[in-house]
From Swiss-Prot:
The lineage of its organism: Bacteria, Bacillati, Bacillota, Clostridia, Eubacteriales. It comes from the Bacteria. On the 2D-gel the determined pI of this unknown protein is: 4.7, its MW is: 45.7 kDa. This is Unknown protein CP 4 from 2D-PAGE.
Length: 14
């Protein structure tokens, strides 16, 4: 579950 988190953080800063 690494890319998941990455997506969450990436979407959060947008």
């Amino acid at each position: 579950m690494y890319e998941v988190x990455i997506v969450v953080v990436y979407a959060a800063q947008i």
